Every structure is written in C-alpha cells, then in structure tokens.
Curated annotation (Swiss-Prot):
It comes from Klebsiella pneumoniae subsp. pneumoniae (strain ATCC 700721 / MGH 78578). This is L-arabinose isomerase. GO terms for biological process: L-arabinose catabolic process to xylulose 5-phosphate. Catalyzes the conversion of L-arabinose to L-ribulose. It comes from the Bacteria. The gene is araA. SUPFAM superfamilies: FucI/AraA C-terminal domain-like (SSF50443), FucI/AraA N-terminal and middle domains (SSF53743). Its EC number is 5.3.1.4. Gene3D superfamilies: 3.40.50.10940.
C-alpha cells in the first residue's frame, strides 16, 4: 500500500443538453469505457472515479464543491466530450481548490471516413470544446494542466500519471508538519525564511521542538526494541569490525539504534513527516543522528540539516511525488569540486545524512567514525556510492516577496577512484551544461548549498510542481546561457513584483 491508495481522482465529462438525451447517453457510455480502461490498463498511481455529467452550471458547481470537501479527492480530470459552453464552468472553477487537468482527447482515434456525418461531429467535439474550456481558464487567470492524446496512448497515460503524482503530493503537503529539533545553524542565511508565507503558499507548517523533548522519548526506548533493530542492521548492511559485536564502537551502534527508534516514535506521535536537526543543538543526545536520519529518509520522511526546513519539506514533497518510481531521492549538498579541463565534477555529500534510496545495489557499509563538529560521540552512518545516470538537484529559497525553485539537470557518474578515507555516502556528477555555467547561474539566482537530489524525478516534474503551486522556477540545463539566464531573472523580478 502506498500514499496513492489514500486518494482518488475524479473524472468529469463536460457536455450540454443541446444535443438531446441520446447523445448524452452515448457520452456517458464512452466515459464509462474510457475510465474503466484507464483504471485497468494505464498503470495510473490513483484510481479514476467517474462523476455524473456536467451539463449545467449548477451540476458543475456541485461537483467542484463536493471535490473541495472530499478528503479522498486529489483533483479533477475534465474531458470536454462535446461542446460545453464555458460560462457554465465559471462558478465551479471559481470555488475549486483542487488541482485540475484537462484531458484533451476523444473517444475515437481515427475518423470514420466513409460514415462520418453531423451526428458524429456533434458528439465528438473535443477539438473545439476543449478550446472553449481553455479560454475560460485563461480569462479567469486560472492555469491548469493539459494533456493531449488519445486515451489509449501510452504517453498520455504517463503524463496523466505524472500529474496525479503532483495532485496527491499537493494534498499531502497541505497536511505536512515539519518538526525542527532546535533552530537554524547560527548566522546561516539561506536556511532561514518566512514560515508563515510558506504555510500560506504550500500548506505545510513548521514548528520547533526542544531537543530535550526528543531526548525524553529516546531514553524511553527499551533494550529489547534496540536489540531487534540492530538485528535488522546486521542483515541489511555490511558492518565494519568496529561496529560488529565486540567491536570497539559497538555501543555507538546501539546508541544510534536508540536514537532512530526515539526519533521515529516522536515523529509518529506528532504526525510529522519531515524534520531537521542541527549539530549546534544536540544536548542530551549521545551523537549527531546520522544512521537514524538516513533510515528515516528511506522510509519517506523529509529531512535537512542545520534547521533547513524548506529543503526538508521539499524532500518530503518530492518523495511523495516519486513513490513507486525507479531511482531514489535524497537530501544532498554540493560539497567540493574536481576541476579537470572541461570534465569538471561535483562531489555531493553531507556530514552523514544521505538517503540509501540513491545507493547502488551493493549493500551499504555501516561504520562508526569520528565527526569533527558537534562535540559528541562518534556517530554511526551508512556509507555507499550512488547510482549513475540522469538526475536533478533542486533548491527552494525564500526571496522575501516570493519563493524560487531552482533545478539543475545533472548526470551522475561513477567514482573513478576509491575514497578510503572519506567515511560518508556520496554522489559524483557532471552539472549541465557545464560546471562553470551551472555554478555561476546557481549563485546568481541565490540557490542554496542544500538541495534535494533525485534520480526518480526530472525537470518536467519540477516544472509541473512549480506551476501547480504558482512559484517561480529557475532552470539550469543544457540550454542555459548566462546572458539570457540573467535576463530571465530580471524579467521574473518585474513579473512577480507586479503580482504583489
């Protein structure tokens, strides 16, 4: 069972009574066939639920109102089977607060050249009925998603499925609670921001809990529960001699297990699905949570270090979007560079907290090593290399008057040499279009040093996310050129300034 099983998407057919009851019966029959086929064959993440035809303003308003108040409804897919005068949709669209996708399709794929007549033409009017619907969306300044293609087309299925992921993610985000254990890393700017503005824009709430509250729960964990979790560690990872039974760091592994169980219990009791820590606020904890954070991210929790609540929330959002897709999604940080005459690389990592969902198939190593900051005992952590292939890194920043999402497309590459003295998980990548352009553009646009790294999602996913939440998107990819990139930032400043 996944988060998508908690939601459904309503399939709404737009028509009118102009064409008579027989035409509406055929429309209904077509709609039933399409919905049943999509549910059975399209591999959509959510179930489609067919709703009654929308043929009058009152019917349409009723459907939209019901969608707003149904917690299971993640959004609406609308198909304009016949012509549906768009003034009928104004009241409904005015009150609708769920994501909307217009499926610009028709029942038949090919025209019946020998038999086509005006009855057929009146029944199958997506081509211009869809344009009428598009106009009212533009007139109302309500941007919605559009997918064009026959309902049996696999590309259309994939695009609808991708939109469904966004719709469910948006509903989940409205209920998302982010727990900050302690505050920001002192004097750091980009990890701070306006939590009230974020809750208004995205729906997630951010609040702080004292580390002492967490410590109370951590200390209440039983030895039996710790032993059972360590058994799981033994079967899931390759433990170094120091971490094994009778190893000189075995107690550190037991302490890490206690922290993991305590953190998970605290998060579950509070209904949190994202959290932050900071190495400057660990009073009462024996070590900086490393292994615990890695495993909680693997279970779907959002996380970021140093109190970075925006990245923690973004990680949770992107994990929901990517549920069930190939590839992983993790907290990440651009750590250091490898300059090599145009073959420049970025080594990404963090102090400890990289999610195992992005690891290669090889079992991660569980090790205990010193950590030079935090002033605590040596923390346990998982060490691994990352899968190779196309990926993205994304950063959400607060510019004061708006939120900006930065996305850089990258290519993850194999590590050319062993890293015997680097005791943390890491990823090595080529930034697109090249490191010079990508880093300069990122810096000019104010991108954070913390990011969300994902093999599972792509630029189109993040573009749709930005559109759904009406936030600025700044893209750095193979098409990026710095002069035009700077121009776009200036234009965005004017555009978003006009919306204040």
């Amino acid at each position: 069972m996944t988060i998508f099983d908690n939601y459904e998407v309503w399939f709404v057919i737009g028509s009118q009574h102009l064409y008579g009851p027989e035409a509406l019966r055929q429309v209904t029959k077509h709609a039933e066939h399409v919905v049943n086929s999509l549910n059975a064959e399209a591999k959509l993440p959510c179930k489609l639920v067919l709703k009654p035809l929308g043929t009058t303003p009152d019917e349409i308003t009723h459907i939209c109102r019901d969608a707003n108040y149904d917690d299971k409804c993640a959004g609406l897919v609308v198909w304009l089977h016949t012509f549906s005068p768009a003034k009928m949709w104004i009241n409904g669209l005015t009150i609708l607060n769920k994501p909307l996708l217009q499926f610009h399709t028709q029942y038949n794929a090919a025209l019946p050249w020998d038999s086509i007549d005006m009855d057929f033409m009146n029944l199958n009017q997506t081509a211009h009925g869809g344009r009428e619907f598009g106009f009212i969306g533009a007139r109302m300044r309500q941007q919605h998603s559009v997918v064009t293609g026959h309902w049996q087309d696999k590309e259309a299925h994939q695009r609808i499925g991708g939109w469904m992921r966004q719709a469910v993610s948006k509903q989940d985000t409205r209920h998302l609670k982010v727990c900050r254990f302690g505050d920001n890393m002192r004097e750091v700017a980009v990890t701070d921001g306006d939590k009230v503005a974020a809750q208004i824009k995205f729906g997630f709430s951010v609040n702080t809990w004292a580390v002492g509250d967490l410590v109370q729960v951590v200390n209440s964990i039983s030895d039996g529960d710790i032993s059972a979790l360590v058994d799981e560690y033994e079967s899931s990872y390759r433990l170094t001699p120091a971490a094994q039974v009778h190893g000189d760091k075995r107690q550190n592994v037991l302490d890490a297990a206690r922290i993991e169980l305590g953190m998970k219990r605290f998060l579950e009791q509070g209904g949190f699905h994202a959290f932050t820590t900071t190495f400057e606020d660990l009073h009462g904890l024996k070590q900086l949570p490393g292994l615990a954070v890695q495993r909680l991210m693997q279970q779907g929790y959002g996380f970021a270090g140093e109190g970075d609540w925006k990245t923690a929330a973004l990680l949770r959002i992107m994990k929901v979007m990517s549920t069930g897709l190939q590839g992983g999604t993790s907290f990440m940080e651009d750590y250091t560079y490898h300059f090599d005459n145009g073959n420049d690389l970025v080594l990404g990592s963090h102090m400890l907290e990289v999610c195992p969902t992005i690891a290669t198939a090889e079992k991660p190593i569980l090790d205990v090593q010193p950590l030079g900051i935090g002033g605590k005992a040596d923390p346990a952590r998982l060490i691994f290399n990352t899968q190779t292939g196309p990926a993205i890194v994304a950063s959400l920043i607060d510019l004061g008057d708006r939120f900006r999402l930065l996305v850089n497309t990258i290519e993850t590459v194999p590590t050319p040499h062993d890293l015997p003295k680097l005791p943390v998980a890491n990823a090595l990548w080529k930034a697109q279009p090249d490191l010079r352009t990508a880093s300069e553009a990122w810096i000019i646009a104010g991108g954070a040093h913390h990011t969300v790294f994902s093999h599972a999602l792509n630029l189109d996913d993040m573009r749709q996310f930005a559109e759904l939440h009406d936030i600025e998107l700044t893209v750095i990819d193979n098409d990026t050129r710095l002069p035009s990139f700077k121009d776009a930032l200036r234009w965005n400043e004017v555009y978003y300034g006009s919306k204040r």
